[in-house]
Amino acid sequence: MQEVAARYPGKVTFVSENFGGSKLADQFGVKGYPAVFVDGVLVASPREFGYFGEVEGAGRYAPWRNAASQAKFKDDLSRMIDLILAGRKDVVTREHPADAAAPRELAALPALTLTDLSGRPIARDDLAGRVVLVEFWATWCPPCRSTLEWLGTLKSKYGDKLAILALAVESPEPTVRSMAAALDPTVRWAIADAATAQSFGDITAVPTMFVFDPSGKTARVVYGAPPDLHEQVTPLLDSLVR
């Protein structure tokens, strides 16, 4: 985005806002990230991004780490800026209605067809009756490591009443295995495929945490690694784990 803004010296200023601290995001009901606004218009919502692009319903710029996806985003963003600078903000607003930004709400733990790193299948039925915490992460994500270390302490605290699934995206298997062995073997580690990520509404940022109550209903979704993560999640788990 900074690269695109730099094409318009003196006309476009790039501003980065932290997730959870954006008035524009609150105004549009944006609950995840990334999201891109141009002159007050939401031109790319979180649902347009994602780490997988080969499944039905994938966003326009998924898979995001693909060079072609990033090139398309830059072209589209340049076009939006050009229209606004030409006095055609109405076109941009018409092409990006506010209701299109509605987040995908995940009501309950989806069906799972995964195999963990030890070769054991992970199935939703096997998790029934327990609180389930699902963490999507990546080996190249610095905040993910500290969050994963914390998950190990949660497993020690709650034992078998809490199932923790650490699902890696966009990460080489040897590195995933190495990190899993170094961090906590009691957490169930697996590599998420496209279908799994899509069943969670696609994953547009890491880390992303889902907490499900013993009945399987979604209790909390946490995007990123906010400074109050422990304060958000620990009391919730205390109330759910019985």
PLM regions and their residue ranges:
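Conserved redox-active cysteine motifs that mediate thiol-disulfide chemistry
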Residues: 136-153
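C-terminal partner/receptor-binding element of secreted or periplasmic proteins
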Residues: 64-97
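Short pre-active-site segment immediately N-terminal to redox-active cysteine/selenocysteine motifs
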Residues: 130-132, 137-140, 205
